Amino acid sequence: MLVLFGQPENWHEQDFRAVDDRVRGGSSISHLTEEKDSDGKSRAKFWGTLDTKTLGGAGFCSQATNIKDRTWNLKEFKGIELDIAKSDSYKYTFIIKDCHQDWETSDEKSSLSYEYDFTPIYSKEDQVVSIPFSEFKPTYRGRPVEGAPELDVSKITQFSIMIRSFFNSQSGDYELVLNSIRAIPKNVPFTTHKMSNEKQRLFDDYEKEIAGGSWCICQ
């Protein structure tokens, strides 16, 4: 495994920055803070409050890499592995970009994102979510994009972890603790991950709604 962030090295809070719905007038807030486990190993806690009242049911919080001009070449790898130390039952999104943001302004420059949604098992125990690069879907401001180019894994410019409301399907305080984020070599098998039937139904309804052209304020 190629460690991108975290164990066995330390997490660095300055490598990430908040990109929340406040950029669109919302009230949600996110943090990424480094903490130590019982063995003194570094972990990253993604936490905050997802608000859906201000924007009428919509909302999102995210922490994006904040490393100017950094590019990752992962063409010798086949996916991303999230080593999760602790989680709630919310649905999260892991996002990759292969286009640099506009670092000269304080506003986010909209660009194509490649996203994967996952729902960790509610647990204080370690769990792993493995994501093939082929499963990352192109989106623009939360909407699927048909005919978009494939993710160029040879020039990845940004990673993000996000929680969004999925049209008021979830809100409130959240917390996801990560041991590490790693790239998976081509000769290493993937793990599998499932969500409850009820949560799957809610988010399937969300996918149908955005595919039908409903308004979306998600990043």
From Swiss-Prot:
For this protein, the record's PANTHER family field holds:
COMPLEX I INTERMEDIATE-ASSOCIATED PROTEIN 30, NAD(P)-BINDING ROSSMANN-FOLD SUPERFAMILY PROTEIN
Please name one Pfam family that this protein belongs to.
CIA30
List where in the cell it is found: Cytoplasm; Nucleus
For the keyword Cell membrane, the answer is no
Q: Which GO terms describe its molecular function?
A: unfolded protein binding
Q: Which family does it belong to?
A: Belongs to the CIA30 family.
Gene Ontology biological process terms in this record? mitochondrion organization; protein-containing complex assembly
Q: Which GO terms describe its cellular component?
A: cytosol; mitochondrion; nucleus
User: Mind listing the UniProt keywords for this protein, alphabetically?
Assistant: Cytoplasm, Nucleus
Top-rank taxon of the source lineage equals Eukaryota
Q: Indicate the principal place this protein occupies in or around the cell.
A: cytoplasm
Q: What is this protein called?
A: Uncharacterized protein C9E9.15
Keyword Nucleus on entry: yes
Q: Which organism is it from?
A: Schizosaccharomyces pombe (strain 972 / ATCC 24843) (Fission yeast)
- The residue stretches assigned to a coiled coil in this entry are none
Q: InterPro entries annotated for this entry?
A: Galactose-bd-like_sf, NADH-UbQ_OxRdtase-assoc_prot30, NDUFAF1
